[in-house]
């Protein structure tokens, strides 16, 4: 599996701070299984890639449900922004309509 990722979350995964990637559970994500490998490509530098192994998958109907159930400090938030973390943060990536259509997934990963 190959996915694009912006530089900030890519660095958070690389340093081990982010272990759960949040995505729409669309057709592409429905193909992912535990044990699979994902190659992330930096959206600003295609030569910068990162390979991870899928450890677990957490399916939810919405990011609101996901935010209530997963540890947000593992999802890319940190002590500086955890208090303002909101499911609406994900609407800059995925419209509410698409969230309602596909549902969402938290992909727990480990570095390879």
Per-range role (PLM):
Residues 26-27, 37, 42-48:
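Short, charged beta-turn/beta-strand-edge "cap" motif at the junction between a beta-strand
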Residues 33-35, 47-49, 102-104:
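Short connector loops at helix/strand junctions that flank enzyme active sites
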Residues 36, 48-59:
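Short beta-strand-centered aromatic/proline hotspots
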Residues 1-34:
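Compositionally biased, charged N-terminal/linker segments
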Residues 6, 23-25, 41, 55, ...:
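A structural detector for beta-sheet-dominated domains
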Residues 2, 51-53, 106-108:
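Beta-strand secondary-structure signal
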Residues 29, 45-47, 59-63:
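Short, charged/polar surface micro-motifs in flexible loops or helix N-caps
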Residues 66-112:
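Contiguous surface segments at macromolecular interaction interfaces
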